[in-house]
A protein has these predicted regions:
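Short acidic/polar hinge/loop motifs at secondary-structure boundaries
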Residues: 73, 101-127, 178
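Extracytoplasmic beta-strand/coil segments of soluble accessory domains associated
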Residues: 68-104
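N-terminal periplasmic accessory domains that precede
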Residues: 24, 35, 67-70, 110-111, ...
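Transmembrane beta-barrel wall of Gram-negative outer-membrane proteins
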Residues: 168-199, 208-252, 280-288, 294, ...
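Face-selective signature of the C-terminal outer-membrane beta-barrel domain
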Residues: 224-246, 272, 277-431, 459, ...
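Outer-membrane beta-barrel signature, preferentially recognizing the C-terminal barrel domain
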Residues: 392-393, 442-445, 474-528, 546-560, ...
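Surface-exposed extracellular loop regions of Gram-negative outer-membrane beta-barrel proteins
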Residues: 423-435, 462-509, 524-542, 672-688
Length: 741
């Protein structure tokens, strides 16, 4: 058995090396250096010292739906409606093209559902953010990169998708996107536009006190534009992005509650209700970024200046169309009526920042590099309910960092520190029982803190390394959890509120990891958090409360292992295998991921849970590629303040892919959640109040087709412009900068 494992690891490295040679002839990234085109292979999964990179552009099983659906298929990632996203035990801060979205929970899910997955190039999960990343990155960063380059002198790439579900009735989903790029002697430009239409269903049961069935219609539009001007060796980049989502929810609900007895003023009686409500959400997010890249004779010396401005507005209305009430003790049926407008909420977020990043090589040990820079950011966030501004929140952050990287024989060292100063303040306003407006100050947060990071990596052999990492981070409450208003659904017995008095979370993250080639690894990490933000759901009488709280102390332990297994090791002798000409696009293999995670919270006995993910690729006749994904999380385990009664994930997805026209046209047919096993069923464990049973079911089983067509230009002398759509990334050698390669 040990020989098989060693052989598997050896083959993984051999496949990667051969892959780099074979794929350079077809799937390539193009890079211009003084008129010469250099090719670089795109890998499905790439392990680096501080991150894991998942390619979406060439993975039909990931890009055949919306972004949220693709993310949920990534091995090691857990995404739930009740506690957000985690990767290998670390809370994820979600970035889009290098800039934090600053939203979580339902607002984040809605945003990601509105983005077609075929508009994403790759996703980087940065498990060890260095000093150059804002300390507010928390445990880890998931950076969604939408930038794309067309290959083979392409000037346009079209991607389209259609799928459907059939739960009680037929529901359709479509998405389309187009990527254009061109260049003249003055400047280069890129434009990426797309739309998404999505019909879906959601059924919920909240402790048998509220049962609902929701028909959801989501409409999303986006446009990403970029201009680049070459100024000698320097470069000026101008980007403008816009994302617009309009969603409609139609909810039929019934339940049992303490209800106002309408015939008698200020009287309450038990009763059953049946209602129909319509809710409308209108979200608009705009970003503008200007970057100046100063370059020197030494290509590894870089200086970047960047100014960015983000404005995000949200409107949410819920109208009660009708309501029926049957009171008991004694029985009395009130005629059908309408409650009219139940919720009328708005929010407005504005963020402006300016940052400087500088890096250069230094002579230290066997060679090294120093990176330093600074950031100033100002955020304003206010919310309104029925015209009353009930939250006015301001944050100013000033930070600077210094990080050294050095190499000594087989060792690589990183040592850095980031200093950040926070000034957070604001006011809240509520209407009391007398109808008067009461204003209070938020709990201020005025602190200066240092955030160190350190890592060491030892190369055991070529492409096999052992690494150890530590970093201290902070996570500021997102606008989603600060918002005191309900932006989801309000029933007669449900209260959903944010908490504007939440305090920031401080993380101490430790990790040790053994990586072999780009796919195999085994690792253990622990994240210790103070004031971790968490959702609780509790019951008082017949009323349900959904709230946000700080957990004073929490630790998350995570053990994970990933291993690729080529099927030929079970059927061919080693002598024959070593003569085989490997190409991952043309061999049958399986990738196995397993992880164990345990959430330790004071005064709460949480059991750990296992995460399993298996991806299998089979090459069928006519070069048809079959990809199957199976994902499963063990039930009866603790997840923050919830116990999973059924697995958070239990899905089987299958994708069949065929390429045509010299690989310019890719057609895929797919089936997701074939056995309809995906359901969320949990029981809450609130620190105060009664436990609540919760069940929600989406129409996750869907079938569809997706296409991707790359249109070649007739002018063979035409040149592509590099990625100029807004993207901040850390280069392999360190430093945060606009991508220019």
């Amino acid at each position: 058995m040990m020989k098989k494992i060693i052989l598997t690891l050896f083959l993984s490295g051999f496949i990667v090396n051969t892959y780099a040679q074979e794929k350079a002839k077809s799937q390539v990234k193009e890079k211009e250096i003084e008129g010469v085109v250099i090719t670089k292979t795109k890998k499905a999964v790439e392990q680096k010292a501080d991150r894991t990179i998942f390619d979406f552009s060439e993975q039909p099983q990931l890009n055949n739906g919306n972004v949220l659906e693709g993310i949920k298929k990534l091995p090691g990632l857990v995404s739930t409606d009740i506690a957000g996203m985690m990767y290998q035990g670390k809370i994820l801060d979600v970035y889009l093209n290098g800039r934090p979205l600053n939203i979580t929970s339902n607002e984040l899910n809605s945003f990601l559902e509105g983005m077609p997955a075929n508009s994403v190039d790759r996703i980087e999960v940065i498990t060890q953010p260095g000093a150059e990343f804002p300390a507010t990155s928390g445990g880890a960063i998931m950076n969604i990169i939408t930038n794309k380059n067309a290959n083979k002198y392409l000037t346009a790439t079209y991607s389209g998708n259609y799928s459907f579900t059939n739960y009680g009735k037929f529901r359709s989903r479509t998405s389309n996107s187009l990527n254009l790029n061109a260049r003249n002697k003055y400047f280069g430009w890129q434009l990426n536009i797309g739309q998404n239409y999505r019909e879906s269903m959601l059924n919920t049961n909240q402790n048998d006190l509220l049962l609902s069935n929701t028909d959801r219609i989501g409409r999303g539009y986006f446009a990403k534009s970029g201009l680049t001007f070459d100024l000698g060796h320097d470069r000026l980049l101008v980007n403008y992005d816009i994302y617009h989502n309009k969603n409609s929810n139609y909810t039929e609900s019934n339940g049992f509650a303490d209800l106002p007895f309408i015939p008698v003023k200020d009287s309450i009686r038990e009763g059953y209700f049946h209602a129909f409500d319509a809710a409308y959400t209108n979200n608009l997010r705009q970003e503008a970024v200007v970057t100046y890249q100063k370059r020197f004779s030494d290509k590894s010396q870089k200086l970047d200046f960047q100014f960015g401005y983000t404005k995000s507005t949200s409107k949410f209305d819920q109208n009660n169309i009708y309501r029926d009430i049957n009171y008991i003790n004694p029985d009395y049926s009130f005629p059908r009526f309408s409650d009219g407008i139940l919720l009328n909420n708005e929010s407005d977020m504005r963020i402006a920042n300016f940052k400087v990043d500088y890096s250069q090589p230094i002579k230290i040990l066997d060679g090294g590099k120093v990176s330093l820079g600074g950031l100033y950011e100002k955020q304003n966030f206010d919310t309104q309910s029925r015209g009353l501004t009930n939250l006015d929140y301001q944050r100013q952050t000033a930070s600077t960092y210094l990080e050294f990287q050095a190499k000594l024989k087989k060792f690589d060292f990183t040592l850095g520190v980031r200093a950040e100063n926070y000034d957070i303040s604001g006011i809240t306003r509520v209407i009391d029982s007398t109808g008067s407006v009461v204003q209070k100050d938020l709990l201020p947060f005025n602190k200066f803190k240092l955030f160190p990071n350190a890592s060491v990596q030892y190369s055991l052999m070529n492409q096999v390394s052992l690494s150890a990492n530590y970093n201290k981070k902070i996570s500021l409450p997102s606008i989603s959890v600060l918002n005191p208003n309900n932006t989801t659904f309000q029933g007669p017995n449900t209260q959903v509120n944010g908490n504007p008095n939440l305090q920031p979370t401080i993380f101490d993250n430790y990790e040790i990891k053994l990586s072999a080639f780009d796919y195999a690894f085994i690792g253990y990490s622990v994240s210790s958090a103070k004031n971790q933000v968490a959702q609780i759901i509790r019951k008082e009488g017949k009323n349900l409360f959904n709230e946000q709280v700080n957990i004073s102390n929490m630790r998350i332990h995570n053990f994970s292992v990933g291993l690729p297994v080529p099927f030929m090791i079970f059927s061919k002798p080693m002598s024959e295998i070593m003569k085989f000409n490997f190409n991952p696009d043309k061999i049958n293999f399986m990738y196995i991921y397993a992880g164990y995670q345990k959430h330790e919270i004071d005064n709460l006995n949480n059991r750990g849970f296992w995460i399993f993910n298996v991806m299998t690729q089979l090459i069928l006749p006519k070069q048809i590629k079959l990809t199957a994904n199976y994902s499963y999380l063990t039930p009866r385990a603790g997840y923050f303040y919830f116990t999973a009664e059924k697995p958070f994930s239990n899905t089987v997805d299958i994708t069949l892919t065929k390429k045509f026209l010299d690989n310019r046209l890719t057609v895929s047919v797919f089936a997701n959640d074939i056995f309809n096993g995906q359901v969320m069923q949990v029981r809450s464990n609130p620190p105060n109040g009664e436990s609540v049973y919760l069940r929600s079911k989406y129409d996750t089983r869907n079938f569809g087709i997706s296409i991707n067509y790359k249109i070649p230009t007739k002018n063979k002398l035409a040149k592509e412009d590099p990625n100029i759509l807004n993207n901040t990334k850390k280069e392999d050698s360190g430093g945060v900068m606009q991508q220019d390669k």
